[in-house]
Amino acid sequence: MKKMKSFLGLLLLVFLFSSCESGKNTAKDNSNIEKLEYKESMEKYNYDIVIPQIKGVENEDISYLNLSLQESARILIENIMGSADAGTKEAPVEAKMSYEIKENNFNILSIVVTTYTYQGGAHGITSIESYNINRKDYSLLNYDMIFDENAEDYFNMRMNDIITASRENNGSRKALNTDGKEVLFFDNAESNVKNTVMYFDGDNVVFLYPHYEIAPYSSGMPVFKFDKKDIKKYVKIKF
């Protein structure tokens, strides 16, 4: 009888262990973001590039994303090395690429990639890209996959209201840039949500405008945030 109880107990442990192991087969549990780094410092040029690589997920979207980021890094390095003659010891040409994972409550993996290049002149150029990934199946998401046809008018109206209020109050912290500083917009600035970089941060969807899109370089890159509860009726997918 004792042997039978021991045997049944062993079977139960095996079953529980197997159940736990099977739970790890989901893409979400197995996913792991690793850093891929490229770095070199020479007299006339330097680059410091760090890109994310999503491991443990096998689907076309993630494979495409990983390879695309590698290709972007390769092209950036080639361009910097190719323009090395424009650099000097005092002011070498340079390239930097980094990324940030935005923690949020939308069940979306938001990766924001920032690229900076300097190839001579008064200042360098900073650009930002985002990659939004559904954590349920690890498919890449874009604006039209997430929001319905009425969302565009809503977002543009709200952003234009902020732009107008900011202009009338000479900034007055109505709109801020990525550094948390006030934005002074162009006189003819008009919002277009389709021209923004979109990512998810906390309880907000964030729309970021690149340099010169609606504000001068000195004002940085304006950001507009919309709370999850305010945009719920425009969302097509379940978070």
List where the protein language model places each region:
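Bacterial N-terminal signal peptides that target proteins for export
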Residues: 1-8
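Compositionally biased intrinsically disordered regions enriched in Thr/Gly
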Residues: 21-239
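C-terminal motif of bacterial Sec signal peptides marking the signal peptidase cleavage site
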Residues: 16-19
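Alpha-helical transmembrane segments
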Residues: 10-14
